[in-house]
């Protein structure tokens, strides 16, 4: 009763037939790939249309270097106009000591007053915006010792 029963010969036959089919299929696939390789290796020269050097197409938009030059010129013009706007006048010099006048000439301002809440020319009038970004976590899956750990937050 405790003996294991031997398999029936029918099952053996089925299995052997399936393995021979698989063997045959593998052999066919190998021969196909060889034929494909032979066909591929006929011409050693690269295809005419597929040249290794990138093709240059004439574009209507100006090249990046020209754009950069144009931007630089515009920046210079704006800087020149701003420097002309902020000239020290006689009214600014009234009631100032010699040190303050020298400081105005050097730095462009006379005192260290706070500009908080005041509109100042030339400053980028940017306001703090609360940007909520998606949290990023370190990867622990698909690496050694990864599954028994909680996800670590990357600040």
From Swiss-Prot:
Basic residues compositional bias, start-end: 1-31, 39-59
User: In what way is this protein post-translationally modified?
Assistant: Phosphorylated in vitro by snRNP-associated protein kinase.
Q: Give GO terms: molecular function aspect only.
A: nucleic acid binding
One Pfam family from the record: SNRNP27
Q: Does the keyword Ribonucleoprotein apply?
A: no
Q: Which UniProt keywords apply?
A: mRNA processing, mRNA splicing, Nucleus, Phosphoprotein
Q: Where is this region: Disordered?
A: 1-97
Where does this protein have compositionally biased stretches of type Basic and acidic residues? Answer: 66-97
A single GO cellular-component term from the record reads: U4/U6 x U5 tri-snRNP complex
The modified positions for Phosphoserine read 61, 65, 111, 114, 132
GO terms (BP aspect):
mRNA splicing, via spliceosome
The listed locations are: Nucleus
Q: How does it assemble?
A: Part of a tri-snRNP complex.
Q: Which family does it belong to?
A: Belongs to the SNUT3 family.
Q: What role does it play?
A: May play a role in mRNA splicing.
Name recorded for this polypeptide: U4/U6.U5 small nuclear ribonucleoprotein 27 kDa protein
**Native organism:** Homo sapiens (Human)
The organism's lineage is:
Eukaryota, Metazoa, Chordata, Craniata, Vertebrata
Q: Which gene encodes it?
A: SNRNP27
